[in-house]
Amino acid sequence: MTYHQQPGTCPTCGHRRGSRGKKWTIIVASIAVVGLIAAGVLNYFKIGPFSDKGKPVSFGQEQPGNGGGQAGGANAAKPDSKVLMPTGPAAEFKNTSTLSDGTQVAVTTLDGKKSGFKGKVWVWAPKAYKDPKFKDHGFPVMIALPGGPGFPNNYWMDDGGLHLESSVTKWYNEGKGKPFILAMPVLNPQPDTGGLYWDGSDIPGQPKMGTWLTEDVPDLIKANFRTVKSRDGWAFMGSSSGAFAGLKAVLKHPDKFKAVIASGPDIVPDSRLWNGHEKEKAENNPEVLAKQLIAANKPGTDVYLAFQYGTKESSVIPHVDKFIATYGNKGPVHTRLQKIEGGKHNAVTYIQGMDMGSMQWISEQMVGPVAP
């Protein structure tokens, strides 16, 4: 007997068709999910076509403020605003890495108008910077300087290795730090071949690295980000020779910068390029500068120096201890020391120290984000 089945009435066949369809749906969905995860992983590790590396990055700096730095937009007419809107011109930033929260580290080549030096500067803004509730707010800035050669890279820009950027976010979320914009310039004009370095200073006859760090780099940040007008929103941090440069910058320019985290620092200038320039060398000596600042004791020049060292840094400890004993907490010079048990002379140790209290201490002395 022949059985003529009506279309769609075979439970088994119909079930089989539905099962196959569901399986294909699951397979396609699974492939899509795996693809998204893989793309995210590849992007995170900067692999292949999924990477944002090298792509243009905007920090929302397209609309400069009016009047050479008065707050722009709705706040342009408020000369008493605490916020400095981007002054322009906008720099060409390119992505070097993307963090898990979507924030980006970007780099530009800055042609320093005041120093005459041309070099790379890496920047990063915390996620809070693009939070709508802070859309008109000025953010504090930290200029982060490396030790070692300090050229052609600045190792603080590698969040995958040292986690400075993600740590800033972590400390902010924990109420232990400000949401700093990070500026990470090269420290020296060329590699430190044969132990040659520039002490972050304007050594006669040499590239003006002091002006580069204290004027050109801040000008770049002011041109492209919403910042704090006053010195209360500007700080340095650095390790080793970078700590010296940051320490010296704050003591030399207390009108521009308020605080520094100086980790395993050199205390006095010692580049051989100073030979024959003793006067200029003294003008860039933190001991001399601290002594002068204390003697003058002018209002509005208080500086906050957060020193750090690991307990295994035998060559660093005596010099830092001596500086603090001589100049610490006298007049406008305020100091704090973070000892990192078992710590050595390296950036990993110093991140630990920042987490232990140095970041919170300088953040308590600063402002931001500030409303217009």
Give the residues covered by each predicted segment.
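Non-catalytic cap/lid and distal C-terminal segments of serine-dependent acyl enzymes
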Residues: 2-372
